[in-house]
């Protein structure tokens, strides 16, 4: 009779996961097998319940040595695993614009899951994405009324780039294959996005990226624009980099240029007065498609449904995600001018016009979440609320001018970037130390380089704005 394996029970992990995981390993000839306990499975050969998850954009070893776990959320607050309330100063990752766990959205998702859990949109359809596309089109600048659904901002960008390459080919301009991005641009982590993006660390480990890509300079200029409220006065001439690239490569080789109207992830880089308008003029002059990456700026962040509409510059394509579903279900979208959409559709005599898509494009749960989110934005007037609060937010942010280490403050809409002087021996360390100090004291901020980026849910109250900047001011005093 074969003997049963010996079960060796380990001590439950300490810290934030102690109440969640119980781990057992089965010894058998020196190897370990997984044992299911209370619905959990221990990883083969390991006794660490955090080891399996390879975390994105994270120093995994440092995090897992001292984890910071969020276990629930409501309104303006997260709750940590040790029971503390954490005021959300970043809308999660620029995405929970209406606040957390809004029942209007979660109920819509539950209803959709119980009605139609999945339906393909390849050669079939279901009603929700058609309805959502109409609702989205109505929020876009005039003419951008054709909507393609994705599952993330990265997918939205790669979709937009592929559409931008398909359009000139459909028009018989097949030499237009070049894409233009910008230094310090962030356009997600797909191969298209990292290629047009201007962040070397996002490309370094992955080869050369797409061929035929060039970059304009960024607009960040502390020397001339420090402590600007709203649009900086200096730097519109940097848009002429696009004309320089036209002169270098030939307009007939350039398909599209992509920029974030406001670069959020790389430190709240706000466009100078006239910059976006000049880009639009150069694109018009040379027949170049202009793409605005509004994954961050869409859905109220700068006070309107889109930065394009709010700031009066209409691109040819807009990418979206994040606030589209209030981050309750992953979803992205691409809005395209009707005449450009029609050029692709009409270039094919029959059959599939664009060989591109995703299994989950227009997913029922995501579409339901999107519709409920748009309803909530409209019912509560959150875009207008962001505009109304912008002045108070701006004053509170700029009240930190003169505080220790601060070399610049930038604000627009309900966004702020607080730039810290880099520590000579350890660039980026100050912002990361402030990030940790804020979390330990009940405030979530975002550290990007030497910049603290802030973008609270649009439901933020003035007292909470005071708390955000008050804590930052207080905690900066303890940062070397």
Language model: regions and residue ranges:
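Conserved N-terminal phosphate-binding loop of PLP-dependent enzymes in the Aspartate aminotransferase
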Residues: 43-480
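Short, positively charged and aromatic/hydrophobic N-terminal segments
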Residues: 20, 25, 31-40, 46
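Polybasic, low-complexity intrinsically disordered segments
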Residues: 1-3
């Amino acid at each position: 009779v074969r003997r049963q394996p010996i079960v060796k029970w380990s001590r439950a992990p300490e810290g934030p996961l102690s109440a969640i995981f119980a781990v057992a390993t089965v010894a058998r000839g020196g190897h370990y097998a997984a044992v299911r306990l209370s619905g959990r499975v221990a990883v083969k050969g390991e006794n660490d319940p955090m080891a399996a998850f390879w975390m994105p954009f994270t120093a995994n070893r440092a995090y897992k040595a001292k984890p910071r776990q969020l276990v629930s959320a409501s309104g303006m607050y997260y709750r940590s695993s040790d029971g503390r309330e954490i005021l959300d100063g970043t809308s999660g990752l620029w995405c929970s614009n209406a606040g957390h766990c809004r029942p209007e959205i979660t109920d819509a998702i539950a209803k959709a899951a119980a009605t139609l859990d999945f339906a393909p949109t390849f050669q079939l359809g279901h009603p929700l994405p058609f309805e959502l596309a109409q609702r989205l089109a109505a929020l876009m600048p005039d003419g951008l009324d054709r909507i393609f659904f994705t599952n993330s901002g990265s997918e939205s960008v790669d979709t937009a780039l592929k559409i931008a390459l398909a359009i000139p080919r459909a028009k018989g301009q097949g030499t237009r294959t070049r894409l233009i991005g910008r230094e310090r641009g962030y356009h997600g982590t797909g191969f298209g996005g990292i290629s047009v993006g201007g962040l070397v660390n996002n490309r370094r480990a992955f080869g050369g990226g797409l061929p035929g890509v060039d970059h304009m300079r960024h607009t960040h200029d502390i020397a001339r624009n420090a402590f600007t409220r709203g649009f900086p006065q200096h730097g519109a001439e940097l848009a002429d980099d696009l004309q320089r690239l036209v002169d270098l490569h030939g307009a007939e080789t350039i398909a599209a240029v992509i920029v974030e109207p406001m670069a959020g992830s790389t430190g709240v880089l706000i466009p100078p007065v006239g910059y976006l308008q000049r880009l639009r003029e150069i694109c018009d002059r040379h027949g170049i498609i202009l793409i605005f990456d509004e994954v961050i700026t869409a859905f109220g962040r700068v006070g309107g449904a889109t930065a394009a509409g709010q700031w009066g510059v209409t691109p040819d394509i807009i990418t979206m995600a994040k606030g589209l579903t209030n981050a309750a279900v992953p979803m992205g979208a691409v809005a395209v001018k009707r005449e450009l959409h029609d050029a692709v559709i009409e270039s094919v005599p029959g059959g599939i016009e664009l060989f591109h898509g995703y299994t989950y494009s227009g997913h029922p749960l995501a579409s339901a979440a999107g519709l409920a989110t748009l309803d909530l934005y409209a019912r509560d007037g959150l875009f207008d609320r962001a505009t109304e609060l912008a002045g108070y937010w701006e004053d509170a942010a700029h009240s930190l001018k003169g505080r220790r280490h601060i070399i610049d403050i930038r604000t627009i809409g309900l966004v702020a970037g607080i730039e810290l002087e880099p520590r000579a021996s350890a660039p980026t360390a100050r912002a990361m130390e402030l990030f940790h100090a804020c979390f330990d004291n009940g405030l979530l901020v975002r550290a990007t380089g030497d910049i603290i980026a802030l973008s609270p849910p649009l439901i933020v109250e003035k007292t909470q704005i005071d708390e955000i900047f008050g804590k930052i001011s207080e905690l900066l005093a303890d940062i070397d």
